[in-house]
Amino acid sequence: MFKTTLLFFITALCEIIGCFLPWLWLKRNGSIWLLLPAGVSLAFFVWLLTLHPAASGRVYAAYGGVYVCTALLWLRFIDGVKLSLYDWSGALIALCGMLIIVAGWGRA
């Protein structure tokens, strides 16, 4: 389960970076060259999703829980926004959902 969660976390970072760089280009007048590493990051994100042993729908559903937590970590450490009790509560619920889905992969 740790390996799966770590892989989800790395996958989420690739997705967030792949979306953040075009955002910088569009919203903060960043260089158009930001689109090149964004494309690479998103391609890597898609490839990482293929490494999971479950059906794609289950992978996407379980990945969503880790994505929520990773996005909130990004909010805190990259955007510099303090997390609220609601943020922490939502992340915990999402992570619990992910753990339930992953625990059932071999039983479905």
UniProtKB/Swiss-Prot annotation:
Gene from which the chain derives: ynfA
Q: Where in the cell is it found?
A: Cell inner membrane
Which residues does the entry place in the Periplasmic compartment? 1-5, 52-60, 106-108
Organism (species): Escherichia fergusonii (strain ATCC 35469 / DSM 13698 / CCUG 18766 / IAM 14443 / JCM 21226 / LMG 7866 / NBRC 102419 / NCTC 12128 / CDC 0568-73)
* Chief site of localization: membrane
- Provide a GO CC annotation, any one: plasma membrane
Q: What is this protein called?
A: UPF0060 membrane protein YnfA
Q: How does it sit in the membrane?
A: Multi-pass membrane protein
Superkingdom of origin: Bacteria
Record carries keyword Transmembrane? yes
| Topological region Cytoplasmic | 27-30, 82-84
UniProt keywords (A-Z) are:
Cell inner membrane, Cell membrane, Membrane, Transmembrane, Transmembrane helix
